[in-house]
Amino acid sequence: MSKRAFNFCAGPAALPEAVLLRAQAELLDWHGKGLSVMEMSHRSDEFVSIANKAEQDLRDLLSIPSNYKVLFLQGGASQQFAQIALNLLPENGKADYIDTGIWSQKAIDEASRYGTINVAASAKAYDYFAIPGQNEWTLSRDAAYVHYAPNETIGGLEFNWIPETGDVPLVADMSSDILSRPVDISRFGMIYAGAQKNIGPSGVVVVIIREDLLGRARTLCPTMLDYKVAADNGSMYNTPPTLAWYLSGLVFEWLKEQGGVEAIGKLNDIKQRTLYDFIDASGLYSNPINTPDRSWMNVPFRLADDRLDKPFLAGADANGLLNLKGHRSVGGMRASIYNAVDINAVNALVAYMKDFEKEHG
């Protein structure tokens, strides 16, 4: 096998090599059954055991309380923007949303189709380079829930604190930072996360929802989008994305082998400090985000002269450092350093950036 590149893609993102090798070994013959997971009935004892183990491993990793349901659904996080409102926002109801970037805005725009949305705070006041402190928020007394995105993959903003919302359920889009460090699940009413960043391949979205929030769907909510229907049917009201579910389970096993979320969080801290410290000390590269609000998972940076962008990316590709181009809406560069991107990848990136600066700085 040729040497694997270092993949800094924002999503679908790098997967642990050990997971890929195990999936490869099991591809044609899962545990001596003579068939692939892709060929199994989702109702079979074999796949049900895969699904149950994946859920239990995720519960163990995040210490999910027993009064929360864990769902493995379809449609990605973007479908959740509507699904949340259809399940949790009553007719003529109101919800509070926090705007910290493009993904927050997409959630706001979609939810606005179903009810009144109060944008309780916006990072626009800081040009999306900082997160407004909660003392700046204007929360509604009668909100059905408060929604926010703890990490914005495009702008590179991340909360290092959990908002206080009292008795109002807190809903979080953790697509890009779930499992990256410990988090108190009991502080949330609901968490959702598209898999293709820190969980597994694209095709499945994980929903962690407190049981008292089930059974609130609107009358016209499609059956397939009703969280209670999904929970009552073990996420198998219809045929689920079995391969993505299985691969996500392998990632959970791998995370446990690394020492769990606490251990991976310490490694992620080292990774992000290594990269940000170099950028801050550099004369060629810069990151505009307020230091306490910098993302651990997605590190955007710019070169002092954007005419150097193309040669920088070409050289990176030649050195096996892939997918560093920033999102089209903001430009520049972006290194996504999720759990599966280890310190060797970050060190290789920093070494290349140093060499490029010596040549072009």
Swiss-Prot record:
Cofactor binding note of this UniProt entry: Binds 1 pyridoxal phosphate per subunit.
Record pathway: Amino-acid biosynthesis; L-serine biosynthesis; L-serine from 3-phospho-D-glycerate: step 2/3; Cofactor biosynthesis; pyridoxine 5'-phosphate biosynthesis; pyridoxine 5'-phosphate from D-erythrose 4-phosphate: step 3/5
EC number annotated for this UniProt entry: 2.6.1.52
Entry GO terms, CC: cytoplasm
SUPFAM superfamilies documented for this protein: PLP-dependent transferases (SSF53383)
UniProt-annotated location(s): Cytoplasm
Gene Ontology BP annotations: L-serine biosynthetic process; pyridoxine biosynthetic process
Superkingdom classification of source: Bacteria
Cofactor field: pyridoxal 5'-phosphate
Binding site for pyridoxal 5'-phosphate: A77, S78, W103, T153, D173, Q196, N238, T239
Binding residues annotated for L-glutamate, in chain numbering: R43
Catalytic activity: O-phospho-L-serine + 2-oxoglutarate = 3-phosphooxypyruvate + L-glutamate; 4-(phosphooxy)-L-threonine + 2-oxoglutarate = (R)-3-hydroxy-2-oxo-4-phosphooxybutanoate + L-glutamate
InterPro entries named among the record's database cross-references: Aminotrans_V_dom, Pser_aminoTfrase, PyrdxlP-dep_Trfase, PyrdxlP-dep_Trfase_major, PyrdxlP-dep_Trfase_small
Keyword annotations: Amino-acid biosynthesis, Aminotransferase, Cytoplasm, Pyridoxal phosphate, Pyridoxine biosynthesis, Serine biosynthesis, Transferase
Residues with N6-(pyridoxal phosphate)lysine modification: K197
MF GO annotations: O-phospho-L-serine:2-oxoglutarate aminotransferase activity; pyridoxal phosphate binding
Subunit structure: Homodimer.
Function: Catalyzes the reversible conversion of 3-phosphohydroxypyruvate to phosphoserine and of 3-hydroxy-2-oxo-4-phosphonooxybutanoate to phosphohydroxythreonine.
Family: Belongs to the class-V pyridoxal-phosphate-dependent aminotransferase family. SerC subfamily.
Record protein name field: Phosphoserine aminotransferase
Record organism: Pseudomonas syringae pv. tomato (strain ATCC BAA-871 / DC3000)
